[in-house]
Amino acid sequence: YDVFRSIWGYRDYVIRAFNANKPFDRFITEQLAGDLLADGDQDALVASGFVRAGISSGEGGTIVEELWNNLIRERTEAFGAVFMGMTTGCAVCHDHKYDPLSQRDMYSMAAYFGNIREKSWTGDDLAWEPNQVLCQAADRPAFDAALGRRAKAEAALRDLAAKESKNINAWLGTGPKQVREGLLAWFPLDESKGSDVTERIGGKKYPCEGSPPVWDDYPNLVTSFRTADNTRLACADVGDFEKDQAFTFSGWIRLFEVVSHPEFGTNSGTIISRMDGGDLRGWNLYVENNQLLVQLIHHWPDNAISVSGDTLPRPGWVHLTVSYDGSGKAAGVKVYRDGKAMALTVTADTLSGSIRTPAPLMFSRRAGADTSSLPSRQTGFEDVRFYTRALSAEEAARLPFEDPVAGILARKPDFLAQADVRKAVAGRQDPYARVWTPFEKRSAAEAYFSRHPEQRDALLAEIAAAQKDMDALTAKQKPPVLESGNDPKLLYKMLSDAYEEKIGALTLVCREKETPAFAHILARGEYTQLKERVYPNTPSFLPPQPPGSPPNRLGLAAWVTSSDNPLTARVIVNRMWQELFGTGLVESSEDFGVVGMRPSHPELLDFLAVDFREHGWDAKRLYKMLVMSAAYRQSAVLSPEKSDRDPHNAWVSRGPRYRMDAEQIRDAALQAAGLLNTEKLGGPSFKSYVPPGLFSSVVGTNCCGYENHHGPVLYRRSMYILNKRTMPQPDLEVFDGIDRLASCARRNRTNTPLAALALMNNTTFLEAARALAEMAIKKVPTDDAARLNFMAARLLSRPLTTKELAALTNAQQIFIAEMNAERAGKILAVGEIKRDESIDPVQHAVWMGLASMLMNSDAALNK
C-alpha cells in the first residue's frame, strides 16, 4: 500500500502549462479529459493524470468494491472542491443538508469518473494501468500523430451508434429472434442485491452460502453477479446431463485480474461445472493459465473428452457458449466466443462411460473441499442459460447480443417505436413510452454491429494500429525497473537514471471504457447498498451540459468551461487572489456554499471572473493585474486603527502579509544559501533528508529502505520531493504541508514551537545556514555589520533595522563565548555539501548560528 507511483510526468505538465500561459479553459479540459481530445497530444494525454492522482492500494485483505467506491468518491469530491467550490462529499450518504446538491446529483457526477479502464486494487503495481511511457522529443511529432489517430477513431467508435441509428432502428423493426426452444434453465443474475439468485424458467430461488456475492459491473443491461472468495452457489437440479444427451450452456463471464492456487498455479480455476472435485466425474468449464478448457469425464484421464480453446482476458467480459451434440465424441463439442466459433484442440477423446454425478451444478468451482474444487474466485456472471439441445452456430451468434434486445422488445413493444429519442420525448403522454437508457442503446447497437461489423471493425483496426505505432515509439524508453517488483534499491536507481535521462518516464493517464458510464446511488453511502442506477449528469440546480457534448469527461470539461457555468471562473480567480493575498475574496475557497464564507467583495469577484473568462482565460494577465493593483502594492504595516477595524485584512486595508507555505520556506532557505538547484526543469522525484529510521516501520513496500539522494539533485525545488501519503516529509508537515490523502484547496496556517525547532534542527535548514554563513564570510571578509546585512539581503531582501542589527550583534558575542573547536566540528558536520576547510571552524559555526537565527525570524518566514 502507498507504494511509489510514477506520475511525475503530470507534475511536469502543470509546470510547463503555467510557464507557457496555456489558456486556463484548455488547461482544465486537458486535465479532465485530455485522453478524449481528438486534437490532443502527449501533453494532453499526460494531463489526464489529474484524474488518476487519487488513492490506490495493494494491501492484503482490501475489499475491492469498497476501495473502488472510495476512489470514485475522492475524485468527485476533488472535482467539486477544485472547480465548483462545493463540498460534494456531504451528499454521499444523503442529500446535502445545506446546499441544493442531491444524492442523485453527487452520484451522477461520480459516474463521469468511474468509467476508466483501471483497477482500484493495484497489487502494488508500479505501472498501475492505464499508463503511458513518454517518448523522446525527436519522436513527439510521430507519437502525437498516432495518438490523434487513436483518439479520432475512438471518438468515431463512440459516435457510431448515433450515426447508424436509422439502420439500427430499421434492423430492430425486423424483430430479432429469441433463442427459447429447449431452454431448460435461465439465470439472468440481475437481482442486484441479496444472497439469493432466481432461475427464471421455474422461478426457483437458490441461496449463496459462505461469502455473499458481489453485485457490480455488467456487460449489457443488468447488474452482474460475482462470486466472492468463498461464495458457494449450488444448484442440485440444474445441468444433470448424460453423455448421450445433447445440451448447451452459455453466459457472460468475467475473470478476475489475478488468481493464484497453491496446487494448480496462477490464473487457473473452474468457471462453471457439474462435477465432483474428488472423483472428477461430470462436466466442467475451466481455465488453466487463462486457457479455456471444456471437459466431459467419466474417469480422468482414460475415459473423458477434453478440448482446449482460446486464452481468456483478465479482466474482461466475454460471452461463452458451449454446445455438445450427445455423440460421445470430442468433435461434438463446439465453443463460441462472443458469438463466433472458437478453434479447439482435442486433448482427450476416449469417453465411453456415464458423466452423471450427484454433485450439484456449481458456479466458480467444483463440488467438494477447497483443495479439490479448483475455485475461480471473484468471477463475474451474467445471463447464464442451459438448453436441452445443441444450439446451431447461427443461434450461438444471436445469444450475446441479439437475444437480450429481442427480450426487451418482447417485454416492451413500445421500445421499437420509441427507439428515436425525440419520438420518446414527444410521446411522454403514453404511459409506456420512455427513452432508452445508455445501456439499452448500446445493447441494440452491439446486436446490430454483430451482424454488420464492417464499420466497427475498421475503427477497431485503426485504434489497434495507432496503439501499435505509439508503443513502438516508446518501447525503448520504458523503465525496466517497473517489471522488477518493489525492491527499494531498484526504485532508487530508476529515479536516478530517469533524472539523468538514461531511461524514459512512465506516468498514469486516463483511458475511457467502451461501455457507457454509470454509477449507483448508495444507500447511506455504503458500497454494498446499491440503489438506483444513474448516468453522467451535472447538478440539477446548475445549467446542463452544452448541447451536443458527450456524456463523459469531455462533456463534463465542456460544461465546466462553459460561459453558462456560474462557478468555475469565480472559484479559479478566488484561488488566484488567495495565492497572492493570503486569503481569498471568499475565505472558504473550497466551499462557496451556504456554510462557506460570504464574499468580502462580491462585485470584485464577479468582475475578476468575467474579465478572466472574456480575456481568453489568461492566467498571467490576471496575475499581472493583481500584483500591479494598488491593493497589492500598499504597505503591509498594521496600524492601530487598521488593527481595530480590519484585524484580518478582510477589507484589504493593507498589503498582504502571511507565512509562506512549507515548500516556499524550504526553497527560500536553499536559494538564500546558494544551494537551490534550478538547472533542470521537470524530471523524477527525489528523496530528501528524513530522520533516520523514519520509514523502517513501512514493511513490504519500495519505500521501506529509504535512502536520500545525493549530489545536486538533493537541492532541487520542493515540488520535486518524493512524497509518501502515509509518511509525509517531516520538514514540510511541520509547516502545514499537506499529506495528499485528499485534494486540498486551502491550507491551514498554524504557529507552533515545532516550526521553530524544525528550523533550528532540521538537516536541510542547518545545511542552508552553514552554506549561507560560508558565502557571507567569503563575500564580506571583515565587516561584521556588513556581513549581517549581506545575509539579511539574501533572506529578507532588505537591510537590517538598527534594532535587528543590535540583537544579532549581541547574539554573535554569546555564540563566540560559548563556541569551541569540538562543538564547532559537530555543528558543521551536518549535511552533504563539503565546507571550505580554509575557514576557521569556530568562526564558521558562529556565523552559521546567526544565519539560522535569521532563517527563523518572522521576516524570513512571512511574505
Where are these regions (language model features)?
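Primarily short, surface-exposed interaction patches in extracytoplasmic proteins
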Residues: 1-39, 100, 145-170, 420-713, ...
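Short, solvent-exposed loop/turn and secondary-structure capping segments
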Residues: 1-4, 29-30, 37-44, 60-64, ...
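Sequence context surrounding c-type heme c attachment/ligation sites in exported
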Residues: 15, 36-144, 732, 744
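Charged, amphipathic alpha-helical linkers/stalks
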Residues: 124-156, 404-418
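Extracellular glycan-associated modules
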Residues: 155-479, 483, 489-494, 501, ...
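A structural supersecondary motif
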Residues: 722-725, 733-743
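Short, surface-exposed polybasic-aromatic patches that bind anionic ligands, especially phosphate groups
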Residues: 850
